[in-house]
């Protein structure tokens, strides 16, 4: 099933927007829309791996004790049990595709489920 990612871009004034694009019993695909100055607070998933793939913009991503600047075309893996987060410290919108496997039990499946 084709997903036109650009059709799902939404920007919230007060916090990062997480849009569920698709999901199965084994994966969840989200789009994070992060305006300048917005962030995802550091957190961890004990049973799920997360892969970030930047499609537009740039930002500072942390996994464990290390931080990396990611730009469009870069990816980063946050293994299960390791703290991770991000901040858009730039001046443009940051768009990130996020794959979580398996999806956390509390996550609502996206529209393509």
Region annotations inferred by a language model:
Residues 1-30, 77, 108-113:
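A short, N-terminal "cap"/entry segment at the start of jelly-roll beta-barrel domains
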Residues 29-33, 51, 75-77, 98:
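Conserved hydrophobic/aromatic beta-strand scaffold that supports enzyme active sites
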Residues 30-45:
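Conserved short histidine dyad/triad with adjacent acidic residue
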Residues 39-41, 57-63:
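Short beta-strand segments in beta-sandwich/barrel cores
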Residues 47-49, 53-59:
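Glycine- and acidic-residue-biased ligand/ion/polar-headgroup-sensing regions
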Residues 66-80:
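Short acidic-glycine-tyrosine-enriched beta hairpin
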Residues 80-105:
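Ligand-binding loop in jelly-roll beta-barrel domains
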